[in-house]
Amino acid sequence: MKITDYSPRSGRMIKEDGTVVNIADLLAGEADAVSGATYNIDSFSAQSGRMIREDGSIINIADLIASGQIGGGGGTGGTSNYNDLTNKPTMNNVEIKGTLTGKDVGLVDKNQGAENAGKILAVGFDGELTLVDRNEPLENLIENYYAMRRTGKVYQTKIWKFASNPTPTGEKMLDNTGLVFEPSTDTTEGQDDYLNGQHPLFEWCNVNYIRDADGSPRPTYIEGMEGYKTSGSVDVGAMQMSFYWNWDTSNAEYDLVTISDTPHPELGLKPWPECVRADGTVMPWCIGSKYISGIASDGKLRSQPGLKPERKQSHNNMITNYQAKGEGYWGAGAVRNTFQIIFNIIKGATKSSQALYAGCTSYSFQYEAAVQSEEAHTYFPVTNAQANSIVVGGYVSVGYGYSTGSTISNDRGNDSVHAYADSVKVLSIEDLDENNKAVYLDIPEEGAFNTMPHVYSENLSAPVILTSIHYRSGATDAVRGRHDGSPGSNTDGKRPYRVQGREYAVGGYIVASDTMTWQNEDGTRTVYSAKKGTEHSSVTNTIQSTYKEAGTIPVNSSGSVGDYWIGDVGVDFDTGASYPRAQGSGSSQGVGDYYYAGGTGTNAFREYLQGGNLSVGANAGASCLYSGYTLSGAHWSYLACD
């Protein structure tokens, strides 16, 4: 009901001695009227001042108001000085007067305990307020924060062994049951129950980090802190709380993949390898390099956004390249790749990464200039049909082929292919004429180029070409929120993707710094992987004596050396290396990625190339493995991570 639905009553009330006072005057004093209407007060009868309290006793509020015990006083219809009142309002026994704070009236406990002396309120990773010591080391703050957030929940997915059921789809179990996960893009936010605030294990943030002598990462700044950087002599990582895992293969028909933020020894969980120091100490955080490495302003391989992925990496040159940063730097091992396999199984309930994200695996083209012009432009001319294959936001190079003396090679490993523009973004595609389109590139005006052929000799020239190339780091930063996914599309095969903040599949194989295969005479491959703290080496005898034999890749089911589709993968708990464990059949069954065995050579090491490149299509994926190059093999599509 509205107050205007009620008629006003006379403010006159009868005191105990029979006299009449007007309590409206006593209380209101000179207050403004709430209505323009006026009444003849003599036409209203005076009301009794007696009122019944909750305990049943009776008071006369006319007497109390008139005497000044509540409200105004004096009995004359005026107001009294607040300081003269005998029944002033209080809160927590504190008289309400003057300028008071919540602390003054007891809303904030003055005694917060000696243990909280000097602490301040800060906003945590989840947006909640928490007490922190401004002088406490960042590592301690992170450890305490994560300790308060651990829930003990157990996330498990059952995946079928290929021999019993070829489906790539698994079944979520325990605390994983019923949780919905959908990949996102830069414009579409898929449902992701893992980020609903009830599952802290899956929450991540960006950090700067350094590595100790054994290779273990330590956070130095969190994004949002003064001092956090994305350029210069720093590395950017994705950090989440440390976790425990198991990949139980004991059942004949299925595997159980399990993670939790607490050990759960009854489930046989072990700390994730990235979270364990060489001495066995479990760190409170899990930090992995966020981006594919490029050359930063300090001339060293760094994990930073906006860098051109450094091409032509190999197992051997990575030792030199990363050691330039310090003792504990060797480059990322196979565990960085296994990380995405685990979280794809847990969240996506699938053995096949390409069931969730295709990656930049079907984006290979080289087009000659559709229009030859001596005038320099910042666009490249292509035919209308060719333009349909090019992605705005994708990356290309402009140059010309390399002369072998009698022929032209357009291999991306030739520097000339990148002579005019090297790994630059496509900004837009616009009509040039009725038959052609202009592909505008992210280059300055002084970088404009003409499209006349490059002349090597009177008899040999090379046309100017547009070449698809790896994405620069940070393309997936455009994905909405903290979600997993790709910019633009997760399915068109032309974009990288991220998982738990880490970027993958930018268009090149990733060389594992710590893992390689030994070619056995029977066609099998022994996987060697270095434990944390092990010095990396290119010497066969040293590798065989100091690295761990992490697993065996079976020979093709034909009995002779041959490539095959992967049905199941195996893992090593100490190093985190993953490898083909069983043969499959096609891209839509089992793991659905391809294993390249590397030919019939024997008794030699081969480097571990993971994921695929921009031309292998459905053969690519998180478990794709190429085992065909020597440890010194370097190629334009071989990239690396810190």
Where are these regions (language model features)?
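Fibrous stalk/shaft segments of extracellular and virion attachment machinery
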Residues: 2-136
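Short aromatic-cysteine micro-motif
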Residues: 231-234, 264-401, 415-423, 427-505
